[in-house]
Amino acid sequence: MTRRYFGTDGIRGQSNVFPMTPDLAMKVGIAVGTILRRGHHRHRVVIGKDTRLSGYMLETALVAGFTAAGLDVFLLGPIPTPAVAMLTRSLRADIGVMVSASHNPFADNGIKLFGPDGYKLSDELEAEIEALLNQEAPLPLARAEDIGRAKRVDGDIYRYIEFVKRTLPRDVTLSGLRIAIDCANGAAYKVAPTALWELGAEVVTIGNEPNGLNINLECGSTHPAALQKKVHEVRADIGIALDGDADRVIIVDETGAIVDGDQLMAVIAESWANDQTLKGGGIVATVMSNLGLERFLGGKGLTLARTKVGDRHVVEHMRQNHYNIGGEQSGHIVLSDFGTTGDGLVAALQILAAVKRTGKTVSQICHRFDPVPQLLRNVRISGGKPLEDSFVRQAIADAESELARNGRLVIRPSGTEPLIRVMAEGDDRSQIERIVNDLIGVIANSREAA
C-alpha cells in the first residue's frame, strides 16, 4: 500500500504545510487513541520535542487529539529523541511521541512514534494509523468523563542525564579532558553539557542558545565547521557534534579532523570485542557504509551485516539477529545494550571511554581504517522507473562486473525526492568516477526517466 503520511522516520514535512499541520497532528492523536482504547486500562502517552518554533504548535495539537481520545499525556518539553524512547519505557507509557525533524532546518518538523518497548512502531501499526487518518467518517471521541488529562513532567531531563552517565564504565571518569560540544541549538542543549560536566570533564559548549529558528543552522553534526574552529581555539581534546534531536553524533579529533559514524562504529566494535561484550560476531550498518569498514572488521575476525538505508532497518536487523552495535555513516549509532534508538551522547561516551582507558589521543583512537574512495551523485527524474529499463539494468550489471571484488555499487531511488542515488566505491578513484558518470548518463537518458 502506498503511504500518504508515514515515511521512513515517521511523519515529516514543512511546518503548516500538509501533512505537518496542527489539524493532522490532532487527528494522529485521536487515531492512536482509537487504536489503544481497544484495551481495557487507562492509557498514557509521553511527548517530547526539540527546539523548533513549530514544536509548541504541534505539541498542543497532539495533546488535544490524545486527550480527546481519552488518553493521559505527560509532556517532557525539549528533550533528545533517545530520551523519549527511554522515558516511554520508564514511565510505563503505551506510546511515546517525539516532535522533531532531526537534522533538518527549523522550518521542517516531524512526528515520530514509539511503542511501549521504546522501539519505533511496526509497519503494521503505522498502516493501521494511516487507515484511520484516511477515513472520511469522524473518529470516535471519549465521553466527557473519560477525557484525558495532560501534565508537565518535572525532572525528566535529569532522569535521562543519570541514564546517560550510567552508560560510561564505572572505572572511567572524564577528569582531565577538555571537551568542546556542539548541541546544534537543539534538544540536547541542556542535557549534554550537564552530563559531561558531571562526569568530570571540562566542557566548552556551542550551539546551546536555541531561539526556535536556529536549530541545525550552521551548527551540529551536519555543519561541523564551527566545532572544528572551537576545538582549535580552546585546544580541546575532542569535539562532539550532535544534531537537532541528538540521535546522531560526529566527532572532531584534537587536530580538527572529522570522524564519521563508520569510524566510530569501528572503535566501539573493536573495544567491545576486546572486552568480550560484542554480540553477533560483528556489527550492522547500511549499504552506504564504507568498504574500508568492512575490510577493517574482517581483519579482526568480525562481520559487517548490511541493510537498506535508515536506522529503522538497522535496528530491525539488530533485534532479529542479536547484534548490539549498529549504525550509519551519518552518525546514527545504536547500542542496544543501552537503548532502542540512535543516541549521540551515549555513543560519544563509548569513544571517551576508549580514550581514557588507552591513554591515547582521539586521533590515535578514532582513525581505525583508511576509507576507500566513495562517490555519491544523484540523478533527478521526472517520473517512471528508470531502474527497470533494460539498458539501465545492463549498464548496472556491467559496472558491477567491472568492480568485482575491488569495490561496490549501490543504486537506489530516494525515499523523499524524485532522485536516483548512484554510489560507487573502490580502490581506484578514477575508475569510480568514470563508472558513476557513465551510469548517471544512462539513467538520465532512459525513456523511463523522462
From Swiss-Prot:
The modification Phosphoserine is found at S102. Keywords: Isomerase, Magnesium, Metal-binding, Phosphoprotein. Its cofactor is Mg(2+). The keyword Cell cycle does not apply. InterPro entries: A-D-PHexomutase_a/b/a-I, A-D-PHexomutase_a/b/a-I/II/III, A-D-PHexomutase_a/b/a-II, A-D-PHexomutase_a/b/a-III, A-D-PHexomutase_C, A-D-PHexomutase_C_sf, A-D-PHexomutase_CS, Alpha-D-phosphohexomutase_SF. Binds 1 Mg(2+) ion per subunit. One of its GO terms (molecular function) is phosphoglucosamine mutase activity. It catalyses: alpha-D-glucosamine 1-phosphate = D-glucosamine 6-phosphate. One of its GO terms (biological process) is carbohydrate metabolic process. Belongs to the phosphohexose mutase family. Activated by phosphorylation. Catalyzes the conversion of glucosamine-6-phosphate to glucosamine-1-phosphate. The active site is at S102. Its EC number is 5.4.2.10. This is Phosphoglucosamine mutase. Disulfide bonds: none annotated. The keyword Iron does not apply. It comes from the Bacteria. Mg(2+) binds at S102, D243, D245, D247. GO terms for cellular component: cytosol.
